Regions:
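N-terminal leader/signal peptides at the extreme start of proteins
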Residues: 1-18
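Hydrophobic core positions within the conserved protein kinase catalytic domain
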Residues: 5-8, 45, 64
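Aliphatic-rich helix starts adjacent to a transmembrane/signal segment
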Residues: 11, 42-57, 71
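N-terminal single-pass transmembrane signal-anchor helix
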Residues: 13-41
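Extracytoplasmic/periplasmic mature domains of Sec-exported, cell-envelope-associated bacterial proteins
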Residues: 19, 54-62
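Periplasmic/extracellular, small/polar-rich flexible segments of pilin-like filament-forming proteins
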Residues: 62-142
Length: 142
């Protein structure tokens, strides 16, 4: 208790600056905030990568439906089966392009009148893989 009084007396006499205890409290608070904020930031980044992958798969399915409409309901034999990573625009067939996000790889598996599009993100190995199946019209992820 005496040391606290001495510190207060010194401060009252005009000494300026922070005490060691005050500095330690600030460092501890910053450490706690960092421990909470960093995992949240990493999860948000992963969610953004998953969202980009899902969006690219949806966009590729729209391009594929356009191609099939122009080809009598069938998937052309010359359709490109893989896009990305690193390609920003991917020409799937005859000028029908899809924009591919950074790190996303799209794989198209044609099967006559149906197809599947699988999208994965190389930015993080724990990202989801999205699969669009034209037979069901749905996107699944794992």
């Amino acid at each position: 208790m005496k040391s606290v009084r001495n510190a207060l007396n010194r401060r009252a006499k005009g000494e300026k600056g922070f005490t060691l205890v005050e500095l330690l409290v600030v460092v501890i608070i910053i450490g706690i905030l960092a421990a909470v904020a960093i995992p949240i930031y990493l999860n948000q980044r992963k969610a953004a990568w998953n969202s980009a992958t899902e969006s690219d798969v949806k966009n590729a399915s729209i391009v594929m439906e356009t191609i099939m409409t122009n080809n009598g309901g069938k998937v052309p034999a010359a359709v490109k089966t893989s896009c990305g990573p690193g390609a920003t625009h991917c020409d799937i067939f005859d000028g029908n392009e899809v924009t591919v996000s950074d790190g996303v790889t799209l794989t198209i598996t044609p099967n006559g009148t149906t197809y599947q599009i699988e999208g994965s993100n190389n930015n993080d190995l724990n990202c989801k893989t999205y699969t669009y199946d034209s037979a069901t019209g749905s996107i699944t992820h794992n």
